[in-house]
């Protein structure tokens, strides 16, 4: 079957080629015999790409000069639909989504954003076909295996929100490994929302508060918005400033219902 690659993939390939070329340009002039024609051709090839890179960096610098969000959350959906529209298996879309995480973490880190929450897998997602669920779990394990050392090197802190005890053993162990390895990092904190549902999170918090009231650890009058917030998975993390849904749907899908009361939606 002939696959019509979409422009996002083509652009990504161009970016990779450009980065490689820019990194090896000095080596290029050292190891190759000097030929003016080669030099001119290579310089002409690099000029527009250097300008693009400079433009992107200027945009980042411009954003950093203004107030930026402390906490961005992303509902990572639409991957399956993206693949189906191109005649590809849904797994190809999920793989593209996982690959995009690297770039998302990089840009948030460069901008100085302190918290990034990614909605990777909801409690409702277990209802999807078994093969699709297995693919998503395998991709997460693959990503953490491949990227963990680099994330740690770049001072990224990995945390989770959701009931990870119900995850397949290999996924649970890989997540625990990532959390433990990056525990003391001080860069951007990436919260992976996996087996997460906001309603069940609120129920969990209410039960814990009720237990404390029943055991006299808390007085009824002490219950306020902050106390409830502190008993959520996100306790101690500021509420999101911005929520992005990549698939384009205008719904919250049981994500951070308590925390996004004043969040900008995009």
PLM regions and their residue ranges:
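Extracellular/periplasmic metallocenter environments
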Residues: 16
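Accessible peptide chain termini
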Residues: 1-2, 40
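Flexible, compositionally biased loop and terminal segments
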Residues: 26-266
